[in-house]
């Protein structure tokens, strides 16, 4: 008879704690489900992809092949104490064929944005004299007018010109010269002076 009493109280008090446990587990499962089902990590990944796409579009916003920037280096060797001459920067720059006969002919417009003029001394310690130099930003003079700036032939030196000083802010037609540097030595014709080393940075646009 004891077994009959146990089975007869299923709706009484014997099975009821198990129901409460199951109900409690369901409530806990329901509380956990929002955390499991909300996949918030997917949204930041989509935003990162969009930012990455924006960065790529900025890098490719300017079409390639429409402009170029180049650096050229050339030298003027075997200068004597009384040597004189000039560098005309543009299509007349015969001392730098790679620029004059090369890339300059491939573009309609250019501008030289900086010029580094270096004098490398090769003179003996007993030599005397200097080499004066002058910037003509508009190619208006053909001979040295000023002797203010000088390189001592026994020491050497360097001078840098930026774009605003050399008429290099605006674009120039590739058939026109931009500026000129003139120089003249006051030493002896028998004395070895040295050489010039010139570095120019050039921007080009509108290819032919």
From Swiss-Prot:
Pfam families xref list: Luteo_coat
Start and end residues of each stretch annotated as Disordered: 1-69
GO cellular component, one term: T=3 icosahedral viral capsid
Record-annotated membrane-spanning stretches: none
Ranges of Low complexity composition bias in the record: 1-16
Subcellular location: Virion
Keywords: Capsid protein, T=3 icosahedral capsid protein, Virion
Residue stretches of biased makeup (Basic residues): 17-30, 44-61
Keyword Repeat: no
Molecular function as annotated in GO: structural molecule activity
Family: Belongs to the luteoviruses capsid protein family.
Role according to the record: Major capsid protein that self-assembles to form an icosahedral capsid with a T=3 symmetry, about 23 nm in diameter, and consisting of 180 capsid proteins monomers. Most of the 180 monomers are the major capsid protein, but a small percentage contain the minor capsid protein, which has a long C-terminal extension.
Domain-related comment: The N-terminus like those of many plant virus capsid proteins is highly basic. These regions may be involved in protein-RNA interaction.
Entry protein name: Major capsid protein
Organism of this sequence: Potato leafroll virus (PLrV)
């Amino acid at each position: 008879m004891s077994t009959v009493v146990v089975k007869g109280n299923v709706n009484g008090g014997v099975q009821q704690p198990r129901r409460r446990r199951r109900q409690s587990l369901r409530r806990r499962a329901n509380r956990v489900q929002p955390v499991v089902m909300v996949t918030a990590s997917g949204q930041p990944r989509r935003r990162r992809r969009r930012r990455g796409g924006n960065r790529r579009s900025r890098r490719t916003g300017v079409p390639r092949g429409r402009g170029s920037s180049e650096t050229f280096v050339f030298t003027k060797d075997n200068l004597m104490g009384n040597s004189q001459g000039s560098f005309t920067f543009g299509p007349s720059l015969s001392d730098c064929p790679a620029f004059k006969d090369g890339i300059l002919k491939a573009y309609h417009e250019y501008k030289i944005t900086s010029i580094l003029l270096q004098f490398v001394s090769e003179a003996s310690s007993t030599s005397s004299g200097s080499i004066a130099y002058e910037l003509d930003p508009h190619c208006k003079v053909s001979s040295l007018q000023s002797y203010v700036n000088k390189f001592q032939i026994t020491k050497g030196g360097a001078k840098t010109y930026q774009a605003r000083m050399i008429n290099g802010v605006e674009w120039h037609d590739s058939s026109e010269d931009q500026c000129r540097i003139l120089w003249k030595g006051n030493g002896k014709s028998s004395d070895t002076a040295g050489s010039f080393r010139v570095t120019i940075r050039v921007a080009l646009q509108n290819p032919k």
